[in-house]
Amino acid sequence: MTTRSITLGIVGDSAAGKTTLTRGLVRVLGEDNVTHVCVDDYHRYDRKQRAERNITPLHPDCNHMDVMAQHLAHLRAGEPILKPVYRHEDGTFGPLVRVDPKQFAVVDGLLGYYTEELRRLYDVRLFLAPPEELRRQWKVQRDCSRRGYTTDQVLAELDRREPDSEAFIRPQQRYADIVVSFLPTPGSEQDRLDAELILRPTLRHPDFRSVLDGEAAEGGIRISEIDGETHLRIPGCLDAERARALEEMIWDGLHFASHLRSDRLGEFTIGTDLHRSESLALIQLLILYHLFTATASVALGGEGARTPEPVTG
């Protein structure tokens, strides 16, 4: 590659929805255009060693944070890496694999924003923060069906990990440009989850107000400003017509990426069944908007789409 990769970070606790979101984006962007890196591959210890040391994979000391940052910097610069592989199926490490840079790098995992060195390497930073009750439900479903655990084992592991979740994972939310919480709607199915977004001014977001009916419109999208941040609530039961209007508003700002228009936005699977969520589709489209805004900025000689962040401390 002669130009750098545009880098998206997706951080959240275990079973927060990172893989679902990542797969959808890769599907739309095309596998030939996306390098996907899961930072779980940078665990320092395998499952047996973690048990012997009484340490969880959520703890920074259980991960090669320095190697993670070095590899992400190489990919961002358009350089290949030789990446470790962690196999969730049995909790062991596989052989190293060569990973080549592509137009986009999607990096998901537990500790992607833990250090300042890592945070500087992303063009777009997303954090997934579902309610704990819902996340626990998702983790039980996933780990029992795909990783061979019993329900009691999963719940016990969640309890054991909670101190590290509180200490190391959830605090990273403060560094995200976009925070996404999927929320259950009473009486609705899993493909009808509401989505609540916090949009921070570190990115220039689309103007959603042009297609909104008002802050308290029943059954519609709600928007508010709190402490300089935009809070957006997208109902899972959003009707298709209103969803299309909002999608068209975002696509209007992506005229240079119109070739990516796809009916597959918002698709996800539960077991072997394919579902579609309007709220998930809108979130994925918003992410595409920011990725291509950063792409255009870099192509014109800029640094990306980020706005200057305030100096703290």
Regions found by a protein language model. Name each.
Residues 7-9:
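Short hydrophobic/aromatic beta-strand immediately N-terminal to the Walker A/P-loop
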Residues 1-5:
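Phosphate-binding P-loop
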Residues 32-38, 44-93, 104:
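Conserved nucleotide-sensing/catalytic segment adjacent to the nucleotide-binding pocket
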